[in-house]
């Protein structure tokens, strides 16, 4: 099943929290927490095994959804102690279900990773996961400016924010060119 991290957490407040569907919201928050890798929530979940970590802002939408859950639901702060089975307990780990951590530790990992900066190449980089992206687009360098708190990252060959359309036309000359390169 394909599930989009950014879209999920942008809509979670309106679809689940303000409508009182707290158990569903909790399950989604914790389910995505299990997939954290490189300090990021995947933009494309794809069942957890072929997730794409090509989105700089999905993790921030996830964190906002957690704050909304805490503020809107009764006993919302209890979610911070909820156990999460980590599918990737480290950046280089293969898929596993042997490590369990409370949500608050995973939140901390995401924040510390961003503050320290992260640099990685997407797993399975190439046509198998994106038939239009150039090779350099699979390289990611992301961080947070400690002076401003602004998130930075990406390069002219990838699109890691909400305007993530990758050009696909050789005829038009935009194949492999993001509509909004960073």
Identify the residue ranges that each predicted region occupies.
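Acidic, mature catalytic/reactive cores of soluble proteins
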Residues: 1-182
